[in-house]
Swiss-Prot record:
<dbReference type="Pfam" id="PF02540">
    <property type="entry name" value="NAD_synthase"/>
</dbReference>
<feature type="active site">
    <location>
        <position position="183"/>
    </location>
</feature>
<dbReference type="InterPro" id="IPR029062">
    <property type="entry name" value="Class_I_gatase-like"/>
</dbReference>
<dbReference type="GO" id="GO:0005524">
    <property type="term" value="F:ATP binding"/>
</dbReference>
<keyword id="KW-0547">Nucleotide-binding</keyword>
<feature type="binding site">
    <location>
        <begin position="235"/>
        <end position="241"/>
    </location>
    <ligand>
        <name>ATP</name>
    </ligand>
</feature>
<feature type="active site">
    <location>
        <position position="181"/>
    </location>
</feature>
<dbReference type="InterPro" id="IPR017926">
    <property type="entry name" value="GATASE"/>
</dbReference>
<dbReference type="Pfam" id="PF00117">
    <property type="entry name" value="GATase"/>
</dbReference>
<feature type="domain" description="GMPS ATP-PPase">
    <location>
        <begin position="208"/>
        <end position="400"/>
    </location>
</feature>
<dbReference type="InterPro" id="IPR025777">
    <property type="entry name" value="GMPS_ATP_PPase_dom"/>
</dbReference>
<dbReference type="GO" id="GO:0003921">
    <property type="term" value="F:GMP synthase activity"/>
</dbReference>
<dbReference type="InterPro" id="IPR004739">
    <property type="entry name" value="GMP_synth_GATase"/>
</dbReference>
<comment type="function">
    <text>Catalyzes the synthesis of GMP from XMP.</text>
</comment>
<keyword id="KW-0315">Glutamine amidotransferase</keyword>
<dbReference type="InterPro" id="IPR001674">
    <property type="entry name" value="GMP_synth_C"/>
</dbReference>
<comment type="pathway">
    <text>Purine metabolism; GMP biosynthesis; GMP from XMP (L-Gln route): step 1/1.</text>
</comment>
Length: 525
């Protein structure tokens, strides 16, 4: 079996919103990489032993006092280095070049760079050719400052009308700098550039692929767990489902899954989870029907934050009770993924590889005294999904829209009652079913229904009725940090509204939420 961690790239984070995207792109190319804060020590870099280093972008100005710098060792480690945006500027400054503060001359958005000379990084890449026969590339810029003089040993590789050094290179030392962002899709040939860097320049082999990751994970799980038993909180979400499948392959019946039905799930979700994991895949599952316990605990509580805490607390209590029944369990499995690890790391002393475990199940009690098993902690969400497919989980389950941890507890506004949850479940199922029918489900990033604790007058037949209101919500987004409301066709919305009002007794009015994020959040609570 090839070692999937043998070849690796280190990415130093200077605070750019795109840094995780760089890591995901390198992984897509088939090379393992890790993301660390910029102030990593020489000893830590030596221990990691990367085949190449990427200096990512960042919001600071290199010209400002105390702005972040790459460790000096980066440039003496004897491995290729790629500086992106701020990364190029700090590379230039640290190696004897010059950076000037942008005064109204920054480049933001689409730009076309003109290639001035050949470089390994840009080998065979062009989007167009200008009248002088020089290759042109379509790229995405986002910078105010710019390099005004490059360090000794470097050459200018590309320019724009306002930026004389859009790319620079020292081919001998294999140091490269680009002022644009190759990791974003708007840079059309960005993946090819990153591929040149990781595979050709750094000499990495493309060993990082789903089948190899699964093989490696199973091997490591067997080694870590031995003959012990493991307990896992299975929610039916992507992460816990993939963890369950990996562990099932690694240790079989020594895995016990605890599935807690809190009464806040989607229509028929509990039955689907039990059918798929219990009947179809043959996992050992304890099914806890705790609907009344959760609803009783939330009785009279309307505050969203308080509801979240109650749901988290009750889950932990139940999980604790059930785990005591598994007296032989020595390990607790969790669906911690790489972005959780990065969030926990921070800067200065918290490099992503030395952080404390990230408890993603709402703080399990310390007295459980179980070892932690986190087979997904190196993976991004898109990688987890690809692994899930390889393990035989259905596509529509792995790629369905996000569902909040507290479930309908934060989609029923105000106090949560069984009646409200039942109405909301049915209305939401109609909305999702119609999105699939109209081939719109995968065209929006997230769609759901919200229950409003408001009664509204309606007319049914000859009589009037005074029933509840629901709101439909659908958004389009790339990263869920910002989002546009989805412009769904009027006739589609009309069809959904008609079906809900006619088929769900107790709902008299349907509205559509046309708020963007910001100022609104995607979820209502």
């Amino acid at each position: 079996m090839s070692d999937i961690h043998e070849h690796k790239i280190l990415i130093l984070d200077f605070g750019s919103q795109y840094t995780q995207l760089i890591a995901r792109r390198i992984r897509e190319i088939g090379v393992y990489c890790e993301l660390w804060a910029w102030d990593v020590t020489e000893a830590q870099i030596r221990e990691f032993a990367p085949n190449g280093i990427i200096l990512a972008g960042g919001p600071e100005s290199v010209t400002a006092e105390n702005s972040p710098r790459a460790p000096e060792y980066v440039f003496t480690a004897g491995v290729p280095v790629l500086g992106i945006c701020y990364g190029m500027q700090t590379m230039s400054e640290q190696l004897g070049g010059k950076v000037i503060q942008g005064v109204g001359e920054g480049e933001f958005g689409y730009a076309q760079i003109e290639m001035l000379t050949d470089s390994l990084l840009f080998k065979g890449i062009e989007d167009a050719v200008n009248s002088e026969g020089k290759p042109l590339l379509d790229v995405w810029m986002s910078h105010g400052d710019k390099v005004s003089a490059i360090p000794e040993g470097f050459v200018a590789v590309a320019k724009t009308d306002t930026c004389p050094f859009a790319a620079m290179a020292n081919e001998e030392k294999q140091f490269f700098g680009v002022q644009f962002h190759p990791e974003v899709t708007h840079t059309r040939q960005g993946m090819r550039m990153l591929s040149h860097f990781a595979l050709d320049i750094c000499g990495c082999a493309a060993n990082w692929k789903p089948s190899s990751i699964i093989e490696d994970a199973i091997e490591r799980l067997k080694k870590q767990i031995g003959d012990d038993e493991v307990i896992l909180g299975l929610s039916g979400g992507v992460d816990s489902s993939v963890v369950a499948m990996l562990l099932h392959r690694a240790i079989g019946k020594k895995l016990t899954c605890v599935f807690v039905d809190n009464g806040l799930l989607r229509l028929n979700e509990a039955e689907q989870v039990m059918e798929m994991f219990g009947d179809h895949f043959g996992l050992n599952i304890i099914h806890v029907d705790a609907e009344n316990r959760f609803l009783d605990a939330m009785k009279g509580e309307a505050d969203p934050e308080a509801k979240r805490k109650i749901i988290g607390r009750v889950f932990v209590e139940i999980f604790d009770e059930e785990s005591k029944k598994c007296a032989n369990a020595k390990w607790l499995a969790q669906g911690t993924i790489y972005p959780d690890v990065i969030e926990s790391a921070g800067s200065a002393t918290g490099k992503a590889h030395v952080i404390k475990s990230h408890h993603n199940v709402g703080g399990l009690p310390d007295h459980m005294e179980l070892g932690l098993v986190e087979p997904l902690r190196e993976l991004f969400k898109d990688e987890v999904r690809k692994i899930g497919l390889e393990l035989g989980l259905p596509y529509n389950m792995l790629y369905r829209h996000p569902f909040p941890g507290p479930g309908l507890g934060v989609r029923v506004l105000g106090e949560v009652k069984k009646e409200y949850c039942d109405l909301l479940r049915r209305a939401d199922a109609i909305f999702i079913e119609e999105l699939h029918k109209a081939d719109l489900y995968n065209k929006v990033s997230q769609a759901f229904t919200v229950f409003l604790p408001v009664r509204s007058v309606g007319v049914m037949g000859d009589g009037r009725k005074y029933d509840w209101v629901v709101s439909l919500r659908a958004v389009e987004t790339v990263d869920f940090m910002t989002a546009h409301w989805a412009h769904l066709p009027y006739d589609f919305l009309g069809r959904v509204s008609n079906r809900i009002i006619n088929e769900v007794d107790g709902i008299s009015r349907v509205v559509y939420d046309i708020s963007g994020k910001p100022p609104a959040t995607i979820e209502w609570e």
